[in-house]
Curated annotation (Swiss-Prot):
Keyword set, alphabetical order: Chloroplast, Membrane, NAD, NADP, Plastid, Plastoquinone, Quinone, Thylakoid, Translocase, Transmembrane, Transmembrane helix
Protein family membership: Belongs to the complex I subunit 1 family.
Subunit-level organization: NDH is composed of at least 16 different subunits, 5 of which are encoded in the nucleus.
CC terms in the record's Gene Ontology section: chloroplast thylakoid membrane
Keyword Plastid: yes
Database matches in InterPro entries: NADH_UbQ_OxRdtase_su1/FPO (IPR001694), NADH_UbQ_OxRdtase_su1_CS (IPR018086)
Subcellular location: Plastid, Chloroplast thylakoid membrane
EC number(s) from the headed UniProt entry: 7.1.1.-
Name of this chain's protein: NAD(P)H-quinone oxidoreductase subunit 1, chloroplastic
GO molecular function, a single term: oxidoreductase activity, acting on NAD(P)H, quinone or similar compound as acceptor
């Protein structure tokens, strides 16, 4: 399509129509926090959906019913969980480092929300189309383990401290293969922009998605993403049988709730980047660019379809991640590190070399 839906221009035009030309600058000021606020609300609602899916899928795997009393099909159960955490007492251990103990959850959650700045839900449906958007995500996601280490050390608890150390070791081990797999995709797209990466997969629909051009990188990225999210079988930093609850052991109330939200938001953003890098982003399986007329109603339809396809692909990844959690056993810490350093890192480097060689030849 030649013209795409520009939300900012549409918002400013609506402000001009409602309150006059003299207040167009006011509309520009109001626009600044609006996308960020909308994204935070949508991400939080996404967490509620994931929590409900986790409960229902785990119940299906274990042949149970799952939540059914909290509203229709148990849809209000995640909301009840959140309200319960809000009203719990916020306990700070007596001999803990209060500053580190308090700042830790915020340092974990804030970078995860910032990653949504570069997630495209459509050609213009992105908050910040940075030229280095994909590496902005990798850089910003590397901050979260620092918060986990702060939380573990500040708790003055041996189990919490060990959980924080495990989180740091796990992040370092799997950040490298993750970044190298991303670099292979960027070589194919000739860009580090998330929008350009999606556009490079739009020529022939599903046939040009990077999952077919980068099958090795896709599998390596999938494993590394699950490890970065600390999902089973890679949840060593909070292994109940070994570390009680890891770095979360001393936390209660909303501070514990921040870890809870951060874990699921991180899983959601990882699903978004799997979609962007390997599954064609907002594009459907069939190439329809240029088919729809260039009129405002069809621009809105195109934007709606883009958001729908992005969310469908993202929740497909989430379904696989949840199913993996309830079907595979936890690995040992030595197996976790061996998988990262002795398997994924050489495989991702070989995939990068192969991609660069084919790029030079063809």
């Amino acid at each position: 399509m030649t013209y795409v839906l520009d939300l900012k221009r549409s918002f400013l035009d609506a402000c001009t129509w409602l309150i006059g030309d003299n207040f167009r600058d006011l509309g520009s000021v109001l626009w600044v926090p609006l996308p960020i606020l909308s994204l935070v609300i949508v991400a939080t609602l996404g967490v509620l959906v994931i929590v409900w899916l986790e409960r229902k899928i785990s119940a299906g795997v274990q042949q149970r019913v799952g939540p059914e009393y909290g509203g229709a099909l148990g849809l209000l159960q995640p909301l009840a969980d959140g309200l319960k955490l809000v009203f719990k007492e916020d306990v700070v251990p007596a001999k803990s480092d209060t500053w580190l103990f308090t700042l830790g959850p915020a340092v974990v959650v804030i970078p995860i929300f910032l990653a949504y700045l570069v997630v495209p839900f459509g050609q213009q449906l992105i908050i910040a189309d940075l030229r280095i958007g994909i590496f902005f995500w990798i850089a910003i996601s590397s901050i979260a383990p620092i918060g986990l280490l702060m939380s573990g050390y500040g708790s003055n608890n041996k189990y919490s401290f060990l959980g924080g150390l495990r989180a740091a070791a796990q992040s370092i081990s799997y950040e490298l293969p993750l970044a190298i797999c991303v670099l292979s995709v960027c070589l194919l797209a000739d860009s580090l922009s998330t929008v350009d990466i999606v556009e490079s997969q739009s020529s022939w629909g599903i046939l040009t998605w990077n999952i077919w051009r980068q099958p090795i990188g896709f599998v390596a990225f999938l494993i590394a993403a699950l490890a970065e999210c600390e999902r089973l079988p890679f949840d060593l930093p909070e292994a109940e049988e070994e570390l009680v609850a890891g770095y979360q052991t001393e936390y209660t109330g909303m501070k514990f709730g921040l870890f809870y939200v951060g874990s699921y938001v991180n899983l959601l953003v990882s699903g978004c980047f799997v979609t962007v890098l390997y599954l064609g982003g907002w594009h459907g399986p069939f190439a329809i660019d240029g088919i729809l007329p260039d009129s405002p109603p069809f621009q809105v339809l195109d934007a709606f379809l883009g958001i729908t396809w992005t969310l469908l692909k993202t929740f497909l990844f989430l379904f696989a991640a949840i199913l993996t959690r309830w079907t595979l056993p936890r690995v040992r810490i030595d197996q976790l590190l061996d998988l990262g350093w002795k398997f994924l890192l050489p495989v991702s480097l070989g995939n990068l070399l192969l991609t660069a060689s084919l790029k030079l030849l063809f």
